[in-house]
Amino acid sequence: MSTGPTAATGSNRRLQQTQNQVDEVVDIMRVNVDKVLERDQKLSELDDRADALQAGASQFETSAAKLKRKYWWKNCKMWAIGITVLVIFIIIIIVWVVSS
């Protein structure tokens, strides 16, 4: 067993290599943690935007239903007015034919 300077230098070299590998792994893990935190923030923002979009879609759906109902009633009123005008016109023609 040699315990001279060469053995100590080899041991120190291996220790330094191991320390360098540990430092590299630590740096990689820090980068990964930063990426995970950034991803979490982006997901949170995306979730907030999705909630806002859902609320907007729900409001649009309600407004569209009200508008559909409003124009359905307008259409019914126009039909009623058209039928009334037609009936009055027919009555006028009948009265004119009978009185002639």
From Swiss-Prot:
It is found in: Early endosome membrane; Recycling endosome membrane; Synapse, Synaptosome. The chain crosses the membrane at residues 78-98. Keywords: Acetylation, Coiled coil, Endosome, Isopeptide bond, Membrane, Protein transport, Synapse, Synaptosome, Transmembrane, Transmembrane helix, Transport, Ubl conjugation. The keyword Chaperone does not apply. Ubiquitinated by RNF167 at Lys-66, Lys-68 and Lys-77, regulating the recycling endosome pathway. (Microbial infection) Targeted and hydrolyzed by C.botulinum neurotoxin type B (BoNT/B, botB) which hydrolyzes the 59-Gln-|-Phe-60 bond and probably inhibits neurotransmitter release. The record marks 41-43, 58-59 as: (Microbial infection) Cleavage. One of its GO terms (cellular component) is recycling endosome membrane. Its main location: membrane. Residues 14-74 form the v-SNARE coiled-coil homology domain. GO terms for biological process: calcium-ion regulated exocytosis; cellular response to type II interferon; exocytosis; Golgi to plasma membrane protein transport; membrane fusion; negative regulation of secretion by cell; positive regulation of receptor recycling; protein-containing complex assembly. Residues 2-77 are cytoplasmic. It comes from the Eukaryota. Changing residue 77 to R: Abolished ubiquitination by RNF167. The modification N-acetylserine is found at residue 2. One of its GO terms (molecular function) is syntaxin-1 binding. There is a cross-link at residues 66, 68, 77 (Glycyl lysine isopeptide (Lys-Gly) (interchain with G-Cter in ubiquitin)). It holds the Pfam family Synaptobrevin. Residues 99-100 are vesicular. SNARE involved in vesicular transport from the late endosomes to the trans-Golgi network. This is Vesicle-associated membrane protein 3. The gene is VAMP3.
